[in-house]
Amino acid sequence: MTKTKPAPHRVKMHVKKGDTIQVISGKDKGKVGEVLRTIPSHSQVVVKGVNIRTKHVKPRQEGESGQISSYEAPIHSSKVMLYSTKEKIASRICYTVTDDGRKVRMLKKTGEIID
């Protein structure tokens, strides 16, 4: 019998859905895109226009033709950095507290507040 691997524990991620990021390693290095979905249990993110895979879909009904569809596959979150669209530069983040007491994410290189 084969055992299934238990899901790894949830890890806090530095990116959220809707963030603009830049890929820093791999075949899509340098590409900029928006985070469509995060998968914290595996520390992965799905980014628009990055890691495109093709899938061959069989016809479901008789007379219908098969298709080749493409989709974005997840990549590891350590391969991405947050990207400043104003300064056109990727940066690490730090957490700061604003004057009104909110904890926000800030880009280290530019000082730009993200959320």
Swiss-Prot record:
Q: Which UniProt keywords apply?
A: Ribonucleoprotein, Ribosomal protein, RNA-binding, rRNA-binding
Cited NCBIfam families? rplX_bact
- Give start-end of the signal peptide: none
Q: What GO cellular component is one of the record's annotations?
A: ribosome
Which organism's genome codes for this protein? Synechocystis sp. (strain ATCC 27184 / PCC 6803 / Kazusa)
Which InterPro entries does the UniProt entry name for this protein?
KOW (IPR005824), Rib_uL2_dom2 (IPR014722), Ribosomal_uL24 (IPR003256), Ribosomal_uL24_CS (IPR005825), Ribosomal_uL24_KOW (IPR041988), Translation_prot_SH3-like_sf (IPR008991)
Protein name according to UniProt: Large ribosomal subunit protein uL24
Q: Which family does it belong to?
A: Belongs to the universal ribosomal protein uL24 family.
Taxonomy of origin reads: Bacteria, Bacillati, Cyanobacteriota, Cyanophyceae, Synechococcales
State how it assembles: Part of the 50S ribosomal subunit.
Q: Which GO terms describe its biological process?
A: translation
One Pfam match, given by its short name, reads: KOW
Q: Record's Gene3D superfamilies?
A: 2.30.30.30
What the protein does comes down to: One of two assembly initiator proteins, it binds directly to the 5'-end of the 23S rRNA, where it nucleates assembly of the 50S subunit.
Q: List the disulfide bonds.
A: none
Instruction: From the UniProt record, report the name of the gene that encodes this protein.
Output: rplX
Q: Which CDD domains match?
A: KOW_RPL26
Q: One MF term in GO for this entry?
A: rRNA binding
